[in-house]
Amino acid sequence: MPRRKQQAPRRSAAYVPEEELKAADIEEDNLEDDGLSLDVQDSEYLYNDEHEIKETPSYQNSPISSATNQDAGYGSPFSETSDHLADFKSTSSKEGQDKEDGQNTENVSYPTDSLAQIKAVYTNLLSECCWSNLALDLKKSNENSSPTTNTNKSSMSEATGSTSDPDTPTTIPSSSCTNTSTSISVTTSNSTNSNSASGYDWHQAALAKTLQQTSYGLLPEPSLFSTVQLYRQSNKIYGSVFTGASRFKCKDCSAAYDTLVELTVHMNETGHYRDDNKDRDAERTKRWSKPRKRSLMEMEGKEDAQKVLKCMYCGHSFESLQDLSVHMIKTKHYQKVPLKEPVPAITKLIPSTKKRALQDIALPDSPEQAGISPGASVSESAKDPKAANPYVTPNNRYGYQNGASYTWQFEARKAQILKCMECGSSHDSLQQLTAHMMVTGHFLKVTNSASKKGKQLVMDAVIEEKIQSIPLPPTTHARLPGSYIKKQPDSPTGSTHSEEKKDPEKEKVNNCEVEKRIKEENEDPEKIEPATLYQYLREEDLDTSPKGGLDILKSLENTVSSAISKAQNGAPSWGGYPSIHAAYQLPGTVKALQPSVQSVQIQPSYAISVKTMTPDHNSLIHSPGSLTPPTHRSNVSAMEELVEKVTGKINIKKEEKVLEKEMVIPAKPPSPVAKENKEILKAEEANGKVLKKSNEADIQKPKKETPIEPHALNGTEPLKAKVTNGCSSLGIITDHSPEPSFINPLSALQSIMNTHLGKVSKPVSPSLDPLAMLYKISNSMLDKPIYPTTPVKQVESIERYYYEDSDQPIDLTKSKNKPFVTSITDHVSSPLRESALMDISDMVKNLTGRLTPKSSTPSTVSEKSDADGSSFEEAMDELSPVHKRKGRQSNWNPQHLLILQAQFASSLRETAEGKYIMSDLGPQERVNISKFTGLSMTTISHWLANVKYQLRRTGGTKFLKNLDTGHPVFFCNDCASQFRTASTYIGHLETHLGFSLKDLSKHSLNRIQEQQNVTKVITNKALSSVGGLIEEDSSSTFQCKLCNRTFASKHAVKLHLSKTHGKSPEDHVIYVTELRKQ
């Protein structure tokens, strides 16, 4: 049996005889037997109907009832199905029915057609007494014209209307079933006590038409939801009159009651309050739990409910959310739901008529191909009834049929689903993909690229195809099938069209090269030798595949990624470090003349590893993370030229000639890019080096070489000597901090360009190429080295790199020093360049503010110098404490912390019991601290509040422990001394500061300004000795127009404006006056 027969709605005891209620209870008991067939139960149910009808008065001679089925012209399908039963209803008195009750019921021949039973049921429903008032006028008009030949047939329908339809999804309002003798005054004399009246023709005719036109395709075997497809009708067909007037309804059987007491009595009698979810395995295929529940299928429609209330693991649909929840809890399927495949973005943008064709192309071949596409119809998926799944819905948005087919698809397409969106590498599990994302930082790239959707339409479609459709699963060693490549899921930018248009021959070439690289990569993974020639890409490999350049570079990215993972797993192949963390430790001493080039692994937001190669291999190996945004055609054309050049299509002599022409006549923006790259290749080949390039190096260089355009515009020569910036020394390696170390990719690439360009110098006229803007960005973001000042020697390119030992980690949070050193000291520093660099600096800070972790060293105000050493850094820390960068205490000026800690210790009050009580600093003390340190009152308040919170929560902070125990211990940050009393601690801190806290108010801002001026003089001397470029005139100071305070640098004024006055740094021109010193 497909489902349990639904019980008839119960009427209130005030309107239904007790015998009828008892009969209904007997009927419910009979329906509990689930082993009977559909026909037997239906006949049994009709028997119960007949039993109730015989106890109810019947009025066959009514002219209204005789007109029930004949006027609409539908051939009275209901009366035909009732012929067998009408013969037993010829008696018009209740007594006659009682006499014949025991004699005739066993001889009744019942219809076996379930559709005919449904029609009979609805006939009974529509002849209910509650409709008589509404249809009175219609009945009057039909009285005279209707024949009376079918009186017995229609009166049977009326009589059975005294019982409710057991299959209707709504409730008959019992309050309307009153004595209607006054309303039916037009009937014959027999209609004196009418508890059951006639139905109407218009509604019955409409229902007959609906039933005749509806075809119910029965499956050969009953399924879980066949009853829903067969019997359940939406209540929207009948309008709002079926909603019922009673307020209290039984959820199980939909019986309606006027009072809560009656509903409670019903619940107790029938046990309908019990939980029906106790399905036994044997019964699960025969019936369904909670059949009368008001479900989403009734309210919203069957298909929508099946789409929403579907188990993602096994594919079963459910009538209500409660059933789905019970299923999930019982089967634990919520723990087994696999990773859902990404929905192609292209399907959201195209009409549904085109979705099927795209899905046929995009999905891999599978046994369920015909039924899994979102646009597929039910008829397609049900061509083979035994293969078709009964849970398939027409609008299956998840693209699978059931648990088995979905699992098959997931396994078959796991390499595509668990794929890094950035580099295309596939993984065997979600954990491996997560680890890959964390190691490479690709999650940041994907996030950033996803936020820039819609801005990448400038790229050539052909190049977009090449870039987005490169299948590179480095963890897959077997040859990939052709359908795997053709039908991979869309990338986040939606590349379905590009995949359809890809050239299959080019795919073959690319895939061969990819597999070749993968095999080379995995041939000897455990070798420790850093100089293994065939482990990385060679120029010979590039020569063999002129068309597959992009794929080769992409494969090299994966090779480098695998090297990183090996390093983290303890089996490095590049430097002999036991782990990647050991690579961050500074060696004790490094030979000064060691010419090795340090190659920095660059990521979008931080450095993954630092590789130190032997002197024989000055190779630059970069990570997969490419910082190039594909936003301009010139980038693409430059890349194409670069690939052609690397593959040997253009010889070097021709490049030299073009380079000479380029010095005189500036051409299109991509041209100088390619020419300089060719010059780089020539220089490297002349030195006999084995060049190992990566995608980042090749694609970023075009952006970094146009720097020379604005440089030459301002009358300066390009770089001729290697600068002691971050990428030329181990000083770039930072110590361990809670956050990942950040190496500026732009500055690292600039140093690479400095390395390769060496003595290349050519003046180029400025062009409108947006690539030129990146030069300014790189200038403003170059990392600051912290080394003792040493003059940079003009030596040959092989001996230009020195490793300088320094204990001080580099401050990577400020882009204040741009170390550019040239052999020409007569440079021009134009105001235009100065202001442009400041604007670019502001823009870069806005772009990279959240990605830049805070440094563990104190940062300083000055951002105006182009080169600096650690001695000047320390001097400025001591002498210019104004406007420090606020944040964690690790970024604070130690002097400021000493002052704040001393003031806090002085505010502690000792009680008679020997304990200390925290008291707040007075406003005057705060003002004194603010005047001396330059810290805002808000910053001071926040620091104090943070210290108090830590003391209350844990009883201690960095400089004070055990305050709550009555035996506090004070710690000095400078010398790690410990003190037991606040007075001795304050005295000790004053010795570090060099003055007493009482004298703090005597120090004015003028003293601080003088110290800044002294620092400026020292810095200027250092810059003149190094010959660096100075952005600002050393004889100028800047005054805030709002408060008339003066500052030594523009950046200090802008910090002041933003922190003190809340002004945007971009508005500094409005609020700043530049003062020239005489």
Swiss-Prot record:
PROSITE patterns: ZINC_FINGER_C2H2_1, ZINC_FINGER_C2H2_2. InterPro entries: HD, Teashirt_fam, Znf_C2H2_type. Keywords: Developmental protein, DNA-binding, Homeobox, Metal-binding, Nucleus, Repeat, Repressor, Transcription, Transcription regulation, Zinc, Zinc-finger. It is found in: Nucleus. Residues 271-286, 497-524 have a biased composition (Basic and acidic residues). A zinc finger (C2H2-type) spans 248-272, 309-333, 418-442, 970-992, 1038-1061. Residues 143-197 have a biased composition (Low complexity). Transmembrane segments: none annotated. One of its GO terms (biological process) is regulation of transcription by RNA polymerase II. One of its GO terms (molecular function) is DNA binding. Residues 57-71, 853-862 have a biased composition (Polar residues). Residues 885-955 bind DNA. GO terms for cellular component: nucleus. This is Teashirt homolog 1-A. It comes from Xenopus laevis.
